[in-house]
Swiss-Prot record:
Organism: Mycobacterium leprae (strain TN)
Name by which UniProt lists this protein: Dihydroorotase
Keywords: Hydrolase, Metal-binding, Pyrimidine biosynthesis, Zinc
Cofactor: Zn(2+)
UniProt-listed PANTHER family: ALLANTOINASE
Positions of Zn(2+) 1 binding: H57, H59, D151, D304
Gene3D superfamilies recorded: Metal-dependent hydrolases, Urease, subunit C, domain 1
Annotated metabolic or biological route of this protein: Pyrimidine metabolism; UMP biosynthesis via de novo pathway; (S)-dihydroorotate from bicarbonate: step 3/3
EC nos: 3.5.2.3
Binding-site positions, substrate: H59, L60, R61, N91, N277, H308, P322, G323
This protein's GO CC annotations: cytoplasm
Protein family per UniProt: Belongs to the metallo-dependent hydrolases superfamily. DHOase family. Class I DHOase subfamily.
Residues forming the catalytic site: D304
């Protein structure tokens, strides 16, 4: 089967070209390519072609909470958002702390076939922070687990974290830390600041995140290990990351679209959809995060896609489960916050949403150059078409988007996974 993408601009640059995909690879790039008789032609005149997006941080809820999301609906949302590979966090039921669970998640992703679903293995048994899991067995299993995290919980015991980093280094895998000192966040539901004080909400201090980021940078330095920081949310974290990188410490970090765009002023409505961990911070933090992404201090954008059913969100703010949808809106939010103001080019978007996450995770066939012979994991974006977000109109089984009724720029018009069209015109095969 052949697919011809007609009239695209690679990375949004240069002249319009046609891109011919044959089988699983890019077969030809040029102007006026003859259309094979059997080709599926996608007219994408003056649209942007990017390598398929890669998300290091999602919650697909399977196994255990399929009422909120499952691998099929999550994969559909990912494909419609331009993603070709996603990483599913281990806070499922049961926890993904053994090859039984991680291999199940991998196989389910393969069955659905819309994106490559890579399970993230737990660092500690049951996410309890005490006993290390058999990371080697998960890395050697069918899923070949590349990233380990207790996300949702912090590996807060420094000795356990140091042992995890040492173990991971020997296996050639990565530890991703949910940076939260739990003794500073007991009962916290909102950023600690004037807004939380005025609204009577228990505050989550910046220091809860920053203290763990600093500690883990030092642990990684001493262990000669890599460490990845999940969902950076404060200006102070940016400064610590900058210092650590200047010292030659092997540390990478991600930021979510919602922390780039939103701030804690939204909490005035007491709408549970705005509760998220780490919490929405102040405007100054969002500005610092945007600049850090532009400067390369923060390496990549991840969604932290966290579906929750209505009965888990439509409650009083402090009782709402934390998390937001993100897979279908991420690219548009990045365009809004980073491309429109001139902080990033489309080529930069490819770097922070495809190339860097693929490199961090060690995915050899994603985040590749747009060249002949490369895998046809591709995303086509119309930069000139806006769309209005509605939770009910998203592919996820849940509707907890913080962007309800917002009009966002840029629309994904097609996604290809190894040459197979997995989304087209905001429709998915699922």
């Amino acid at each position: 089967m052949s697919v011809l993408l007609r009239g695209v601009r690679l990375y949004g640059e240069g002249e319009q070209v046609d891109v011919l995909v044959e089988g699983e690879q890019i077969a030809n790039i040029g102007a006026g390519i003859d259309i094979p008789d059997t080709a599926d032609v996608i007219d994408a005149i003056d649209q942007v072609l990017l390598p398929g997006l890669v998300d290091l941080h999602t919650h697909l809820r399977e196994p255990g909470r399929e009422y909120a999301e499952d691998i099929e609906t999550g994969s559909a949302a990912a494909a419609l958002g331009g993603y070709t590979a996603v990483f599913a966090m281990p806070n499922t039921t049961p926890v993904a702390d053994s090859p039984v669970v991680t291999d199940h998640v991998w196989r389910r992703g393969q069955q659905v076939g819309l994106v490559d679903v890579h399970p993230v293995g737990a660092v500690t048994v049951g996410l309890a922070g005490a006993e290390l899991t058999e990371m080697g067995m998960m890395a050697a299993g069918a899923a070949q687990v590349r990233i380990f995290s207790d996300d949702g919980n912090c590996v807060h015991n420094p000795l356990v974290m140091r042992r995890a980093l040492e173990y991971a280094t020997g296996l050639g895998v990565l530890i991703a830390q949910h940076a939260e000192e739990p003794r500073l966040t007991v009962g916290a539901v909102a950023h600690e600041g004037p807004t939380a004080a005025r609204l009577g909400l228990s505050g989550w201090p910046r220091a809860a995140e920053e203290s763990i980021v600093a500690r883990d940078a030092l642990l990684a330095r001493d262990a000669g290990a890599r460490v990845h920081i999940c969902h950076a949310s404060t200006a102070g974290t940016v400064e610590i990351l900058k210092w650590a990188k200047e010292q030659g410490i092997s540390i990478t970090a991600e930021v979510t679209p919602h922390h780039l765009l939103l701030d804690d002023s939204r909490l005035a409505s007491y709408d549970g959809v705005n509760r998220v961990n780490p919490p929405l911070r102040e405007t100054a933090d969002a500005v610092a995060l945007r600049q850090a992404l532009a400067d390369g201090i923060i390496d990549c954008v991840t969604t932290d896609h966290a579906p929750h059913a209505d009965h888990e969100k439509c409650v009083e703010f402090s009782a709402a489960r934390p998390g937001m949808l993100g897979l279908q809106t991420a690219l548009s939010v990045v365009v809004h916050t980073m491309v429109v103001p001139g902080l990033l080019s489309w080529r930069d978007v490819a770097q922070v949403m495809s190339e860097n996450p693929a490199r961090i995770a060690g995915l050899p066939d994603h985040g590749r150059p747009l060249e002949v012979g490369e895998p046809a994991n591709l995303t086509v974006v119309d930069p000139d078409v806006t769309w209005t977000v509605t939770g009910d109109g998203l592919a996820s089984r849940s509707a907890n988007t913080p962007y309800e009724a917002m009009t966002l720029p840029a629309t994904v018009t097609a996604t290809l996974l190894r040459g197979k069209v997995t989304a087209r015109g905001q429709k998915s095969p699922v």
